[in-house]
Amino acid sequence: MRIIGRLPDPRMQITVFENDGRFPVQFELGGVTQVYRFRKGDGLQHFGHVESLVDETFRTGVMEQFHAMHRLHAAVNARLGGSAADDPHGDLPDII
């Protein structure tokens, strides 16, 4: 899998890959990732086609999903009695 480009967006990072006849498009925001995979075909052959596909309507839907994912993550952290911000060690393992 190789990166063929990035799409500018002030809200999130968008990376377009090419892999085995597909274009995976990865969206990242605040430690959460969404990946959508599209098969190459007549209307989808190169980066420019992917760029046209990932329009504002698509991006708005991705942002709505990110908001839902963050709400779920916050709810799970609340059930655990805190948040990741409360953990001084975060996700890092102890090094001896």
Region locations from a protein language model:
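Residue-level preference for alpha-helix termini and adjacent loops
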Residues: 2-6, 35-37, 57
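Polar low-complexity intrinsically disordered regions enriched in Ser/Thr and small residues
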Residues: 8-9, 46, 84-85
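Short, charged/polar N-terminal "headpieces" of proteins
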Residues: 1-26
